[in-house]
């Protein structure tokens, strides 16, 4: 295993998180579904923390982005994702997510110069996700946004084999902690986006919406309400 200062810092934060919870290693191991030796080896950096391990940490209440790359959660009101959730059946929510995404992208692209670099980054990623028919591979979209056509280029950048990279890109394997740290350093998207912890498209819509002007936000909200004009927000929840 290649040890870097960034990975060592992650292991240290893992230890701090455990101690803040007032857990010894045995109790923490139980909380994240490991044996005590398995947990001890991961915290000490003797074994790589896998993507599955990180999902267990997330399920236990850990802030994965803070733990991995020392980044606080981006302030967000989650307006769009909350509205989408009121549409009931998953097929309907996916339809709403798609048309709202198209509408927001259309509005943003006309005013792209008004947004911060971070918001532009989210807009470009959302546009790429919308182009991807499966809408479930962050790494495909990362390659698209950065104009990388050859998997070998990004696998070399990450220091992993093309075979391993291909498995991760095609959702046959979750990226481990070291890969996630490198992805963040290279492209700036937080690790949790690669671990299927939430719907990335909905999260991007929330971030972008918060950056829009109040007038444009009102236009978006009116658009959403007109998608089901016969029902109020509260009534949609009950359907």
Predicted regions and their residues:
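Alpha-helical residues within helix-turn-helix
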Residues: 16, 27, 141, 152-153, ...
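Short, charged recognition helix plus adjacent turn
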Residues: 69-110, 192-239
């Amino acid at each position: 295993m290649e040890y870097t200062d960034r990975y060592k810092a992650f292991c240290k934060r893992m230890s701090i998180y455990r101690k803040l919870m007032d857990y010894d290693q045995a109790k923490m191991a139980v909380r994240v579904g490991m044996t005590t030796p398995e947990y001890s080896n991961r915290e000490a950096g003797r074994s790589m923390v896998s993507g599955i391990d990180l999902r267990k940490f997330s399920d236990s209440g850990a802030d994965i982005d803070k733990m991995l790359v020392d980044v606080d959660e981006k302030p967000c009101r989650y307006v769009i994702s909350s509205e989408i959730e009121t549409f009931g059946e998953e097929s309907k929510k996916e339809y709403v997510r798609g048309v709202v995404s198209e509408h927001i992208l259309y509005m943003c692209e006309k005013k792209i110069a008004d947004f911060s670099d971070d918001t532009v980054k989210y807009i470009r990623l959302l546009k790429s996700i919308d182009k991807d028919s499966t809408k479930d591979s962050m790494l495909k979209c990362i390659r698209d946004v950065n104009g990388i056509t050859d998997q070998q280029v990004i696998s070399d950048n990450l220091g992993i084999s093309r075979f391993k990279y291909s498995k991760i890109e095609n959702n046959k394997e979750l990226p481990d902690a070291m890969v996630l740290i490198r992805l963040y350093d290279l492209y700036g998207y937080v690790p949790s986006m690669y671990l299927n912890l939430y719907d990335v498209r909905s999260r991007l819509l929330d971030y972008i919406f918060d950056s829009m002007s109040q007038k444009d936000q009102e236009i978006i909200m009116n658009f959403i309400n007109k998608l089901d004009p016969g029902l109020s927000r509260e009534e949609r929840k009950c359907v």
